[in-house]
């Protein structure tokens, strides 16, 4: 297990930067990779989800991501800081992380990686209204030891984008199963 490291991120700066799909910023020796994707929640032929169902799904995912994120093999809440905020340990892509979870009801859940080999911030945001509901998954991650503009950086960013798009699809699928009254595996 990695030692806990204090990490903070300016969400206002993060939101301004999230207007593009992918880019990086040098942060000292390391590179911070920014990726954002916005996807429609309600595709034709799928179980319709309203804002409340999506919010409830994001809260469930924050507490136990295993049914929602295929690449995650372990998820355990380790400390509660308030009625809504907490820390959790996860295993993702065969690596252990500690994340601080901050739900901002009813529109965004922020996951701040405070320990592990890749630090940064991940946000899951509900956007627009029920007629055109969208889910934005964004991340700003510092990858230690990866040179900017390198093939390694592009490969890492590409694999993360692929993992997060799979997680979005799995998350929406789990939310639809819940909305349809079907059980979601724990």
Sequence positions of predicted segments:
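Beta-strand/loop substructures that line and gate deep hydrophobic ligand-binding cavities in soluble
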Residues: 114-166
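Short, highly charged C-terminal tails/helix-capping segments
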Residues: 74-78, 172-186
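Beta-strand elements of well-folded, non-transmembrane domains
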Residues: 41-43, 61, 92-96, 141-145
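Glycine-rich portal/gate segments that line the openings of hydrophobic small-molecule binding cavities
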Residues: 77-115
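Hydrophobic/aromatic beta-strand elements that line small-molecule binding cavities or substrate pockets
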Residues: 39, 74-77, 97-102, 120-128
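Hydrophobic residues positioned within well-ordered beta-strands of beta-sheet architectures
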Residues: 35-37, 86-88, 99, 122, ...
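Hydrophobic ligand-binding cavity/cleft-lining segments
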Residues: 7-10, 14-76
């Amino acid at each position: 297990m990695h030692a806990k490291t204090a990490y903070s991120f300016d969400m206002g700066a993060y939101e301004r930067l999230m207007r593009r799909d992918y880019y990086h910023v040098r942060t000292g020796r390391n590179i911070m990779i920014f990726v954002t994707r916005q996807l429609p929640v309600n595709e034709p032929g799928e179980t319709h989800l309203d804002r409340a169902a999506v919010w409830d799904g994001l809260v469930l995912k924050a507490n136990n991501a295993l049914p929602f994120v295929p690449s995650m093999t372990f998820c355990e809440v380790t400390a509660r800081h308030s009625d809504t905020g907490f820390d959790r340990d996860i295993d993702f892509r065969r690596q252990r992380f500690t994340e601080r979870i901050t739900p901002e009801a009813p529109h965004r859940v922020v996951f701040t990686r405070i320990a592990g080999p890749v630090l940064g911030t991940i946000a899951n945001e509900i956007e627009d209204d029920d007629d055109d509901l969208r889910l934005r998954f964004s991340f700003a991650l510092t990858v230690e030891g990866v040179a900017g503009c390198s093939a390694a950086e592009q490969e890492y960013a590409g694999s993360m984008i692929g993992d997060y798009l799979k997680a979005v699809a799995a998350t929406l699928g789990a939310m639809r199963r819940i909305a349809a009254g079907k059980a979601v595996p724990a």
